[in-house]
Amino acid sequence: MSYYYTRMSTGNFKRRGPYNKNDKQHAESKVAPPILLNRLVERYYASNPHVKDVTTNHELEVKFGTKGVKPLTKIDYDSVIRKLKSLGFSCVNEQGGYLLRMYYEHLDKSGQFKESNIRTEISGFRAIQEYCKSNDILKLIGMEEHMRSVKFVKKSRVYDNDEMVHDVNFNDFNFRVSYQKEEEISMSNIIIRNVTQNWTQTKKSFRYINRVTFTHDDFPINVDISIVKSSHREGWDLKKTYTTDEAGVFSNTEVYEIELELDNSKIGPGTRFSNPESILVALRKAIKYILMGLQSTNYPVSIVEQKTALQSYMKLLHGESYDVEKRIYPKNFIGPSSYTLQIENIIPLDDNMNVPNIRRNYVVTDKADGERHLMYISNTGKIYLINTNMNVIFTGVITDEKSLFNSLFDGELILHNKSGQFINLFAVFDVYYIAKDDVRALGFMVENDDQKTRYRYQIIKTALNILKPKSVIKDEGVPMRIEAKKFYPEVIASAGNGSDVSIFAGCKHILTKVENGLFEYNTDGLIFTPAFMGVGGDAIGKTGKLTKTTWEYSFKWKPPQYNTIDFLVVTTKKNGEDIITPVFQEGVTSSDFNEYKTIELRCGFNQRAHGYINPCQDVYDDKLPDFGDKEDDEQYKPVLFRPSNPYDPEAGICNIMLKKDDTGVMQMFSEDGEVFEDNTIVEFKYDMTRDHKWRWIPIHVRNDKTTELRQGVSLNFGNAYHVAESNWKSIHNPVTQEMISTGVNIPDVEGDADVYYNRLVSSNKTMGLRNFHNFIKYNLIKAVSKKGETLIDYACGKAGDFPKWIDAQLSFVFGIDKSKDNLENRIDGACARFLNYRKSRKHIPYALFVNGDSSLNIRNGSAMLNEKAVQITKAVFGEGTKDVASLGAGVARQFGKAVDGFNV
């Protein structure tokens, strides 16, 4: 169902319901919007707006984002400003001017409270600041330095022969053109005198505006781009209150507005814009410029075309039976993400391990500093880009090659070269569909003795050779370059013939090119792709799901100093207000104290998918679930970052020093100068040389992810927990440029080999043997143990014998294993299994698990592989401290449990 939205006097939009032909102001017309626009401009010009009037101003405005389906975002705000600057528009004050607009209520003739069509406006930050001290407009007017900062403005519709002049809605492009009059009302007016006298007893709504205005000598137009904070809402309306504090206007979430307004001083006789036709040409061009900024392309298209392109994309993935009415989410972006490359992914090959290793059947390419997009060639040959937020960009490029219609490629859009010049290069690094044919299951690169003729890299090169792109505008040059990325090695050597050497040679070749400045664009690392596997798959010929996912076999490498994590920032609060802590220094007055905020760093976590955050610590601390506890209904949620490898329970707590913004307000800033606040997703780097809790450094605000979160488009909380853990591990145990270029001087990862063997090796080959083993073990435990006895399990693995321990009605089990992953794995490790069984069984033995070598002496601690394991083992045998705070309540409960040994 379609709705129309009316602009309130507050400047906000109110949904009024389905379009109704009887609605006078926004009635749907059978006349096309371009024709209505012509008529509107003619009426506007006929009113002689260029004739100066001290009190009345004729306004012809274009407002964007009016359809209500897609609110403007910070990304839109920044993108439009960049586009305007690139087109020669300039701004006198890029910090913007400040306005506080207030809309008061009054009693109408029927005795009902109604919002007045006269707004009160305060301009200038200092005047606004002064008003907020008293919330008394009369007091502000009485101040000589601020009295000229206040004005009262009446906004009204325009009539032509008693007929209201309607707005013109361009719904397909999400903007509206309106013609209205503004009249400044004198402070001596009886209405204004009454209002100001009763100001403090009158309820009002507020809009706090930071407005930047861009102009161009060739256009009679002001481009107003605003950041707006408003009063609390009651449904669709702004709530009326007496003061700004009650309204919450300065703490509420900001919204963005973009408007064009004709500058009446630049039109009329004697100017270049002396008739409606010349004004229309300039207006249409300016509208196109804004749409270019909003859509990130010089070829903006309608909302209908964008929607059709997305629906065609979804049909390509899911078939013609796909329900086109389904909402499309960022999870529908099917290009898989990569894990951070770890030491274990580059160590010498070990047949006893099944960890993905780039030494065996991998190719490498440079990681361009661009934006990830899918390139979709439609069934008519139009070429679109789809970004990770599922926004559609028409490239202005078409192809006549019908064999490539309905095809889908993956790549990076690189807008500028290293000198900042616009190159608009789309670098293709994978292909998923060709002419509706799903090619994701094919291998990526050919093997030197392989007779296959189809592999994805060859398909990319062949497709781009026959693409013959051209501009949608006749006789215009192709607006976007489309090229295949270069991968190394181009032919994969057979196993044993130097395949592990060639991958490091490829890395060295790329990194040498980077050092010598031979890449046209900026790079920030390397990407490793399995040579023979299907996209997202875990074996040759298999593919992953048609959804957003992280591919376990795809890796990215960045120089260690560029390893970062995206966190959701949550400020610590007291009574609903952010806690601000002063840093006291001798000889410094209180007004000059440095101040900081303490923030929590959170990332997305799903217990079902990611397991427990730190299951063994939960066991040690006695944080055990009870029988009948259910999975959290909110499966994916933001949780405090408490990494386990290396373990740091306070890694997710961070202090951020505050700095003054342009208005003198103390704010948190990223390294690139952006303000961020509570409920914002920010990219952080980690500096281990700094003091604890000061090591995380905010470097960049992720406006794309923050927009997704705040608009409810998707559950985006920064990096997923497992990705953040992977990056954390890489930060502390980095793969250096020397390692990745040579394959030498790589440290051992002793103790982790079985992690990957257990995780990745298929179990069906050993199923029969394991069944027999379990049968024997079950009978042994049942035969020798009695109810309430204790048991020690050497090399306990992942506690697969838990059902046997439960059936034997044991009271306590002490498990030892050399593999930390067997014990600590968040999903199926021994501790996680213990916690899961607690939910489903009423009676279950208590258990503790420690990391140790069962072939050595356990009781004296020499078998243990870390200090925590030594401490726990001593406690179980009745030695060492009994302090609950030191041991953890779960360990303290079992103190001395095995002082006389174990029963079994």
Question: Where are the predicted features?
Answer:
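Phosphate-end processing signature that detects enzymes handling 5′-triphosphorylated RNA
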Residues: 4-7, 11-323
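S-adenosyl-L-methionine
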Residues: 831-898
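Conserved SAM-binding loop of SAM-dependent methyltransferases across substrates and taxa
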Residues: 798-810
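Conserved SAM/SAH-binding beta-strand->alpha-helix loop
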Residues: 819
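Nucleic-acid 5′ end/cap handling module spanning
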Residues: 60-65, 158-167, 226, 322-384, ...
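Class I SAM-dependent methyltransferase Rossmann-like catalytic core
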Residues: 749-786
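Conserved class I S-adenosyl-L-methionine
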Residues: 788-797, 814
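Conserved loop->alpha-helix
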Residues: 379-418
